[in-house]
């Protein structure tokens, strides 16, 4: 189980802003779908709030098994995966997601942020590894810079 040791500011705003033009409601396009795989409900909700505020469509789940079920029939543009999960590991999930979604941005995260874990995640297919607590500006930058076709 991963525990966030620091509060992360929650972004303000909405992923989809509404503007009224007489009786028509116009929704701005979503930047992309981001799978959030985090077993800690509080950490997961913070990530969902941040991603929503930045204009992404989060797909939150609590385990590797739930993640695979969630993307079975859906497109995914990026994933933020806690590498230490109950049941099947996040590192195993990263490998499977990379096979299925070769163009997706995969970010491994862990409270154990040592260089060996970063190398392991990258070796299994992650584009990036980030230690917890996550810095919102670093996460936003990683999502924006790693994949240009979906923003």
Residue ranges, per PLM feature:
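Alpha4 helix (beta4-alpha4-beta5 surface) of REC/receiver domains from two-component response regulators
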Residues: 92, 113-130, 141
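Conserved acidic carboxylate
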Residues: 38
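Acidic catalytic/metal-coordinating carboxylates
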Residues: 63, 89-92
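Acidic, metal-coordinating helix/loop segments flanking the phosphotransfer/catalytic sites
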Residues: 60-78
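Short amphipathic alpha-helix used as the core "switch/output" element in two-component signaling
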Residues: 69, 91-103
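Two-component/phosphorelay signaling modules centered on CheY-like receiver
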Residues: 41-59
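Non-catalytic signal-transmission and effector/linker regions of two-component phosphorelay proteins
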Residues: 1-35, 137-151
